[in-house]
Amino acid sequence: MRLLALVLLLLCAPLRAWTYSLRYGIPESAQVWSILVHLLGDVDNQLLTNLYPLVTGLDDEIDIQENLVALTSNVLRERYDKEDVADLLELYASLYPMGMIQHDISSNAEQDDANSSYFVLNGNRYEKPDDVFYLKSKDLTIQQKVPDVDVIQPYDVVIGTNSEAPILILYGCPTVIDSDFEEFNRNLFMEAMNGEGKFRFIWRSTCSLDGKSVEYPLTHPLEITLQNGSRMSSIPQLKKILYTVPKEILVGADNDDQLHDLEPEELRELDLRVTSLISEFYQYKKDITATLNFTKSIVNNFPLISKQLIKVSSVNKDIITSNEELNSKGFDYNMLGLYINGQNWKITSLTPYNLLTALKTEYQSLLKITNLLQELEPSKCILDSKFLLNKFSQFSLGKLQNLQPIKMDLHTIPGFSESVIYFNDIESDPQYDELVNSVQAFFDKSKFGELPEIKQNWSEIIFVIDFARLEDSEVKEALGGLVRAVNVVSQGYPQRVGLLPFSSDSDKSVVNKIYELKNSTDNLTELKSFLETMLLADGLSANAKHSKHIPVPDVFHLLDELQIDETSIIINGEIYPFRKNAWNYLIAKVIKKDTEFIRKELSNSSPKNKQISVRDLLHYKSANLRHNKYTPNYFADSVYSSVNNTALESVCSERIGYYTKNEEYNLLHTITLVDDFGSIHALKRLRNLLHTSFVGVRIRIIHVGDISDIWYQLRGSLSQKDPIGSINTFIDALKLKKVKSHTYKKSGLNQLGLHKWLPDIPLFELQKGSFIALNGRFIHLDQNEVPETEHFEAIIKREALRTIDSVFALDLLFPGFSQEIINPDLIEMISSILTRLFYQGTHIYNNGIDYTTESSLPRMDLSEFFRPNNLTMFEDGKSASIDLLLILDPLEERTQMILSLVEQFRPLKFVNIQVILMPTLELNIVPIRRIYVDDADIVKSITSEDSRSDPEVDIEMDVPNSFIVDNNYRIKKLLIELHSFSSKTVLSTGNIDGMGGVCLALVDSAGNIIDKTTTMKTFGYGQFHTDKFLKGCYIKSCDSRYTVQSFSTDGHPDFIPSDSLDILSYNPQKIAVKISEEPTHEEEYEEGRNNDTIINIFTILESGPDEEERYMQMILSILSKCPETQKVNFFILDQPFISDTLRKSCEYINSSDEMRGNVIFLNYEWPQWLRPQRFSSRRRDVSRFLFLDVLLPQNISKVLYMSPTEVPLDPFDIFQFQGLKRAPLGLFRMSGDGYWKEGYWEKMLRENNLEFYSTEPAFLVNLERFRELDAGDKYRIHYQRISTDAMSLVNIGQDLVNNLQLEVPIRFLKGSYKKKLVINDECVSEWKKKINKFASSPGDEDVPGESVSSKYQDSDNAAPLHDEL
């Protein structure tokens, strides 16, 4: 019977495997296993081993009909008491149908082998399942000698009972195509798990996403926007939506089918009324889940029930009091949003994928801390870890606010004071005689605003100006700013102003002249006059020639030390690139911050009447060395990893050495140098490190090269009091090549052990050479890079701050902790985890610097402020490791998304949901205009093919920014964002200007171009789109002026270039690209730009079939009159609502030689850094101008924008207009009376002698001139600046271009260009019949007369559209 059972099991096993669903071609077993490895790989390998037979279909008790995710979750809960892992598994499986593909696994399996199974032993490949039973003992013995660390890769799980047995590798994917996988797997498992355990094995899945379409159906929430006057009956599913509204609110609802905005008096207290209603509900139910559902049902359906809300609710005055109490504690509307243990998440980053990853990362990090705390006291639990994190956040918050960007005490740098030319001295100049020399001035009201009336040189602004670049507008503005500042301080303004002049070219005559005038005896009067004249004149070469060649300070060396290579401004020791739009703001910000810091320090430590040096107080923590790599401006620019010192055992103890200078002090800081110490560079690095003067520092070295006599001698020398002499001897011997050394191991260190030690650093980065690690801070070293001792000291000084904060926090958890002997391994690990959580808590994907204009808040300890009052503050009330705090204004559209998002994560038992309601006391605008539908069944109903809504209703699916959705609400493409910078630019959070106007291409592993983009200047932003998952792709330049020097998915100041990119999941992709300028091939670059035979027409459609019909009519009308010598390109912005019918119609046109036209769909998504535009119609309107420079191919020099009309203007006539030389835009003047003739507009236009222009029905653009003026960047920055006001830009596209005429001029088009095109009706009618027939035919029907070269060409590949281009 047992034999029969085994036979049946073997026969049924393949069936069991194939019953699992395939998603993107990935079997469910592979999906579930990859997720489990992702969740448990660093936590519980034994549990993974136990689950392996269940997941891969080897468990005899498995129900072959049961869903594998549900089955595995039940087993986790019932058999292993792993509720947390079970909940996370279900969430990951629902969001990642492809599983969690690990990017840094080197499979060793060829792509051609993806559909076959085999295993590898000793490098030999075995392709028959029965080969498992005939393995030779000799082969197993040879494999057994290979250390496990040389075999096991990240995310590998070793299956087998005998820990001494050799390891085999199984390759395969359990699909129908790979029919042998089940037998391979079963045979290996049986042999590995039997009593003897001849071997162990690892399964490395060959299931691949590479090249598979990303298309997938979605059921994300829908945003249904209804305008005032819309009829409820326009949405057939509205009755289903209303079922989600509480019945008590719908009581008394009238039968008025039409929606109306509320009157101002009805709006005023409505937010308070709704908050009162929610509060009353919670007080009755005492159930936060029910309360959140109740709140969501109101907020999501607000446009439908606003009238009823007025009738059913009244205002609880206690809520106003609660608001006031929150305000007194520092809470305001800028804090609205979602917080994970006090870590704020930007609203644009809130997606199910990001929130799930953030919760999992937070939870597992706290578990790691808990394990470490239990080494000190076994009774400690995960709540103690949360307490520790909160206290660390308290201590670190000040560091984040005051120590970035890095502040320099510049006067400690040799030569600085002698090089700066100061124009005033507050301590001695007569205009400051009325000031007082007492710090009490910081607490008194000042007539100078933030600057106190104190007679000290504590605050200074230094203009660093490149006088070789005065033609640059930024440099000119800097000089003008200096001249104005000098005039202001001469009137008694108490701020020191200085100049640090330099010249970036070989001509130093102007700089020499400036220093000559500095040394004159006229109290700088002549120098001031010289600078004023220079500002007004075109050049001063004549004046500068008379400069005497007197000795001048070595400014070039000084600026090299400060790493300044462009015109900059130094504000109280903080160095910023000078930008004319930002420098005044920066001065105000820094002075306000520093004044508050000094006031706080004086309050804590010093009597107010005491005379002290304010400057010394300001700079007592300042640096005296600036290095963008070792001590970057911002903590976010650094790379941090958690540290797992227990993994160092696998690295091999004989490769590790330690040195401590003084053991009298606790060793809080461990700096590790990982290097090949058989090289001169490595020994020099170590020598410089050993020269550091700090105590309390442990030095660890890890040798990655061959094990030899030199290494043993070096490691032995570390036990000496002063090993530097021995190291110098080794260096001298290596230089003279007199080293005789026996090599014991001719192999380098396997970096996999290092990856386990620093798990947040990608494996490929650890394999790229030497590096430094300091309590989790990671610094890669180039091959010949040798940091000086002062660099090591600067790194230690900077990073020590966070370690000391860790000790302070531990002191609160373990009183007296810092007074006892501290285990350096423990503090290294705990401080590294706390650092990563606090300083980079939102860097969950390790995808580099987040370039954004959106403000974000640091992690804060909000636990002390959250006090449930059952009125506006309530929570689950359970003790959980994660507090998920929602600070909400009930009547705000963001609240819809947050509540719907959080509902998905309520099953997580380790999450405690907290709510703070902060209603607007007086509403004056309609707060919510959209219905938010998150019920999956209703979403499916609305989005189904046979249940479309009225076209006048705007329906959008709320998907992550990286998802591009089609008209069937399926993922159509994935968005990949990039930021391009000059190879000379050091990447930093402070970077704003990138490389704009550069064409870049995304290329797959076979060399095929997937997509092209043109970059913006702001953040160097660009975007690619892919409709396939990709492995091994890369980025290259498609612009002959530039070359891609390097790129990385983890962009930071010292990033290690990636060899390739993998796009294998839904996680957001952000790529940093470094670009170098190549010699300009002007003729090659300009070729084909101007072609008079091609007319380019650009259009952005509104939604609805009527608009599409007008557009098609316009195309056919224009083509019916197209001369035989010309062709017309119709560019259209691709949008989700565009129908398949229109796409097929365009396909026909592109295939017709008769029509001489081409319709090109352009892809461009709203950039994440740009302030979102809520209403889609306004988004489309302003996009006509915001993205012109990056949306259209670079080889297009002239384009006509036309709104869809059945009888269009004559584009052939307008295109002949030659007046766009200085001005890039040609628009028709606005006629009649309107808002532009009153108020702000009337005044602005009159004072600047400007006209007001209309953007309808067409406008002409000289794209070459548009790009020369950086018009696109100017429009985007102007939009970003003024769109903070919800009432600005009422007619958004039209108002934007009219408002910026002084920077982007407009030329008027004569009224005669408004003449209508005379249409060939007969031709249009005939074409329509053919198109309609083709559009209604099956999708695979060929177009009559279609040739290979004329097939429809999508714009994903922005290649030239015609040979003429």
Curated annotation (Swiss-Prot):
MF GO annotations: UDP-glucose:glycoprotein glucosyltransferase activity; unfolded protein binding
Miscellaneous: Present with 815 molecules/cell in log phase SD medium.
Glycosylated residue positions: 115, 228, 293, 457, 519, 523, 644, 870, 1091, 1150, 1195
Pfam family, one: Thioredoxin_13
Region Disordered, annotated ranges: 1334-1365
Keyword field: Cell wall biogenesis/degradation, Endoplasmic reticulum, Glycoprotein, Signal
Known role: Required for (1->6)-beta-D-glucan synthesis and normal cell growth.
Primary residence: endoplasmic reticulum
Cellular compartment(s): Endoplasmic reticulum lumen
Family classification: To D.melanogaster UGGG.
GO BP terms in the entry: cell wall organization; fungal-type cell wall beta-glucan biosynthetic process; protein N-linked glycosylation via asparagine
Biased composition (Polar residues): 1347-1356
GO cellular component, one term: endoplasmic reticulum
Protein name, as recorded: Killer toxin-resistance protein 5
Domain of life: Eukaryota
Endpoints of the signal sequence: 1-17
Sequence motif Prevents secretion from ER, location on chain: 1362-1365
